[in-house]
Amino acid sequence: MEKTLLFAAIFLCVKADEICIGYLSNNSTDKVDTIIENNVTVTSSVELVETEHTGSFCSINGKQPISLGDCSFAGWILGNPMCDDLIGKNSWSYIVENQS
């Protein structure tokens, strides 16, 4: 059990050098929404989220994300003909859905 925990800790440290979006340390009183709580006071933060997008997305563990383009998630799942170019894509790291 201890070896498993040690291995997991080492693995997480090795993978911890990559940030796509998030917060970095600095004195601040910003409030953020987390996965489990809303309006959490952060005493050390700098917003790293970009206001302009470069057009590229981070790959995770060597897998590229799938971009739905003009297709909605529901349209992709339900088989909308507009989403036919997504047929056959069976492996991705995350889904990018454009706001319309």
Curated annotation (Swiss-Prot):
Residues with glycosylation annotation: N26, N27, N39
Post-translational modification: In natural infection, inactive HA is matured into HA1 and HA2 outside the cell by one or more trypsin-like, arginine-specific endoprotease secreted by the bronchial epithelial cells. One identified protease that may be involved in this process is secreted in lungs by club cells. Palmitoylated.
Quaternary structure annotation from Swiss-Prot or TrEMBL: Homotrimer of disulfide-linked HA1-HA2.
Keyword Transmembrane: yes
Any Pfam family matching the protein: Hemagglutinin
InterPro entries assigned: Capsid_hemagglutn, Hemagglutn_HA1_a/b_dom_sf, Hemagglutn_influenz_A, Hemagglutn_influenz_A/B
Domain of life: Viruses
Protein's name in the database: Hemagglutinin
Keyword ATP-binding listed: no
GO biological process: clathrin-dependent endocytosis of virus by host cell; fusion of virus membrane with host endosome membrane; fusion of virus membrane with host plasma membrane; virion attachment to host cell
A single GO molecular function term of this UniProt record: host cell surface receptor binding
Topology term for the membrane: Single-pass type I membrane protein
Location relative to the cell: Virion membrane; Host apical cell membrane
Function recorded in the entry: Binds to sialic acid-containing receptors on the cell surface, bringing about the attachment of the virus particle to the cell. This attachment induces virion internalization of about two third of the virus particles through clathrin-dependent endocytosis and about one third through a clathrin- and caveolin-independent pathway. Plays a major role in the determination of host range restriction and virulence. Class I viral fusion protein.
Gene Ontology terms: cellular component: host cell plasma membrane; membrane; viral envelope; virion membrane
Cleavable signal peptide: 1-16
Keywords: Clathrin- and caveolin-independent endocytosis of virus by host, Clathrin-mediated endocytosis of virus by host, Disulfide bond, Fusion of virus membrane with host endosomal membrane, Fusion of virus membrane with host membrane, Glycoprotein, Hemagglutinin, Host cell membrane, Host membrane, Host-virus interaction, Lipoprotein, Membrane, Palmitate, Signal, Transmembrane, Viral attachment to host cell, Viral envelope protein, Viral penetration into host cytoplasm, Virion, Virus endocytosis by host, Virus entry into host cell
Stored SUPFAM superfamilies: Viral protein domain (SSF49818)
Family statement drawn from the similarity comment of this UniProt entry: Belongs to the influenza viruses hemagglutinin family.
Other observations noted: Major glycoprotein, comprises over 80% of the envelope proteins present in virus particle.
